[in-house]
Regions:
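Short linear motifs embedded in intrinsically disordered, charge-biased segments
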Residues: 1-238
Length: 238
């Protein structure tokens, strides 16, 4: 039997049976680490998504299948692999770039564009014409989850999300909280978001619009001369 502990414990014994202490484990398809860092899980999901994209190669190369159908295939068979349990992630800026790089690599593979072609992100997105980006879908699902538990009177998830440790972190940077990702993405205070969520129909309509709005990928494109440097980053990632 194995156990994970956050304190300085070297050995555990239960009924005279010694427990093995581990730093991480897979639970319900997600990787849980002792430091609660989501970067390991994000990297793992992106690798699984890359494998799913590779398995689709033979199908995507069939010329009788239209581009629109291939785009729907990627969204139906690759995107869900990556966004599994996404609602619980705390994403840093570096992870945002990796997610966008993965999506760009997928579209380039779908269009069979070599890296030597030096196509910009903007031209690729115009040709694919996706209804929403991978990150836009992720944000929509995360905000739906946020609205769902906020509507509930009481739940374990609500208690865990609102709870925070009062003890100060000495000589360390303050960790990013899950709620910070919500407020930063919507550019609203938490109290204002709570008022928005109370109007359910308006809230879900806003999420539908927000999921199609520009995300990190478009900001990346504008900041890097229509994606030239971003293409280089994506090629190294893939």
């Amino acid at each position: 039997m194995k156990i994970m502990a956050s304190g300085p414990f070297t050995s555990w014994q239960i009924d005279e049976e010694k427990m093995e202490t581990v730093a991480d484990f897979i639970f319900l398809g997600s990787k849980i680490t002792v430091d609660n860092d989501c970067s390991h899980e994000i990297k793992r999901c992106l690798l699984l998504g890359r494998k799913a994209m590779t398995n689709l190669d033979s199908t995507l190369k069939v010329r009788d299948i239209t581009l629109l159908t291939n785009v729907h295939l990627v969204k139906a068979m690759v995107f869900p692999v990556i966004i599994h349990r996404y609602e619980s992630w705390i994403i840093k800026k570096a992870e945002h770039w990796k997610i966008d790089a993965f999506e760009l690599c997928g579209w380039r593979r779908l269009l069979r564009i070599p890296w030597t072609a030096r196509r910009s992100i903007l031209s690729i997105l115009k040709e694919i014409n996706p209804e929403y980006s991978l990150e836009g879908l992720m944000l929509k699902l995360k905000f739906q989850y946020f609205g769902h538990w906020l509507h509930r009177a009481s739940s374990l998830e609500k208690t865990l999300i609102w709870w925070k440790i009062e003890r100060r972190r000495i000589n360390q940077r303050q960790r990013m909280r899950w709620l910070n990702g919500i407020t930063d993405s919507m550019d609203m205070s938490l109290s204002r978001l709570q008022e928005r969520v109370k109007r359910r129909e308006a809230w879900y309509a806003a999420l539908h619009v927000f999921s199609k709005s520009p995300t990190w990928l478009s900001d990346w494109t504008a900041a890097n001369n229509e994606g030239s440097e971003a293409d280089i980053f994506a090629s190294k990632f893939y």
